[in-house]
C-alpha cells in the first residue's frame, strides 16, 4: 500500500538518481587532487592520460615541487609500488638521481653487551634487490611525478578553504572554494595536506578524537657536524668518514645514530619521555644538562651527548603520529598520505605508504566511468589501505622501540635484539603489493556489481509505477487516499 505522496517521493528519488548517473556518465569525471607533495604528485602520475577523467591538481605552495624534507629516504617497497603505478613512475627514481644510504651497523650502546654488534645490514642477503634506504632529492622526483600532466591542470598557490557537498541531482556533487576566491566543481576530491591540514577534519570531523596528531613520547635532537669534529668526538671506530657506514647505538630509552651524509656527519639522538608535550610548539628548548642526562647512559667513548649539546642548537623535535582513523573516506572526499596516516621518523616507512595510497587510488579511479564507480573505488581504497597502512605504522613503531631497548623480553640483549630485528626485516619484506592491488580491484568490481543489481530492481519497480501515472494525475486532489498497487 502506498500513498500518492510516497509514490511521488519514490519517483522523484529515482529520477534524481538517474539524472545524477547520466550526468556523470556523459562527461569526464572531475578528479580534484589537493595538497601537493609525494602522494598527490604520484596520484597525478597514475591518473594522467585517462580519457574518462579530468584531473585538476591544486597545491597550496607557490612551487609545485616543495617539500618539508631535504631528502626522501625510500625503503625497498617504494620501488615496487612505483612499478605498479605505471612504467614511467617505475623509472622515476633512476631519472631523478639517487644514491644508497650507507648500510646500518646496529650496536648495543650500554650495559654488559656494550659495543657488541647486533646487526650489520651490509652482511645480510639482499632479498629485495634494492638498497636498505634509497636517498632521492625531492624536487626532481616530484617533477618526474608531475611530468606529462598538462600545465593547465596544475594549480599552485591554491589553499582550500571550504568544501560544499551538493544535492545528488547536481551536475557536480562537490564545490571547492579556495583562498583566492576561485571555485572548482568536482566529482571527487583526494587530498593530502599533511598531518595538521584540513583534509583529515573534512573526513573525520573537526571534533573527532583521532583528528589531531598525538605525541609519541619521543623527542629528538639533530646535529650536523663537520667530519673532522665528528671523528675527534666519535673516534675512528664510529666517526671515520671513509668507513661508508652509519652506526646506531641502542640504549635503554635512548638511541643515537651517526652517518656521513652530503659532506657532514649527521647525528640524531632520540629519547623516551613521559612529559605532556604541547604540540602547538614544533620544537622546544633543551639544555646541556638535559642532553647529558638523557644520553650519558650510552658508552662514554661515543661522546654522543657532547655532539648533541654542541651542534644541535639545543632544540628538540617531538615525534608525532596519527591515531588510527576509523575511515579514510567521507562520501566523495578521501584523504591519503600524511593526512591519513602520518608516521614518525622512527617508523621511517611513511613515504612508502604515501606512494602505495596513490598507486591503489590511481588503479581504481582509472576504471571509474560514473559517480557510482567512484564511490565503489573509494570504498575499495578504504577497505584495503587502512589495515595495510596501520599495520605499517605499528610495524615501524616497533623498530623505534627496538632501537631504544624498550621491547619487553628483548631490551638491550644483543642476541635477542638481532633475532627481533631480523624478524622485523622479514615481516617488512613479506607483503605482496601485487596481491594488494588485485584485492582492491576485486573489491571495487564486486561493489559495483552488488550496487548495480540493487539499482536494476529499483528501475523495474519504477517502470511499473510509471504505468500508473494517469491514475496519479486523476487522483491528485485526493492526496490522502490509499492506492493499492
From Swiss-Prot:
GO molecular function: monooxygenase activity
Organism expressing this protein natively: Phaeosphaeria nodorum (strain SN15 / ATCC MYA-4574 / FGSC 10173)
Pathway: Secondary metabolite biosynthesis
Essential cofactor(s): FAD
InterPro entries: FAD/NAD-bd_sf, FAD_monoxygenase
Gene from which this protein is expressed: elcH
Phylogenetic placement of the source organism: Eukaryota, Fungi, Dikarya, Ascomycota, Pezizomycotina
Glycosylation sites: 126, 147, 157
Described function: FAD-dependent monooxygenase; part of the gene cluster that mediates the biosynthesis of elsinochrome C, a perelyenequinone phytotoxin structurally similar to cercosporin. The first step of elsinochrome C biosynthesis is performed by the polyketide synthase elcA which catalyzes the formation of nor-toralactone.
Residues reported to bind FAD: 59, 73
Name of the protein in its database record: FAD-dependent monooxygenase elcH
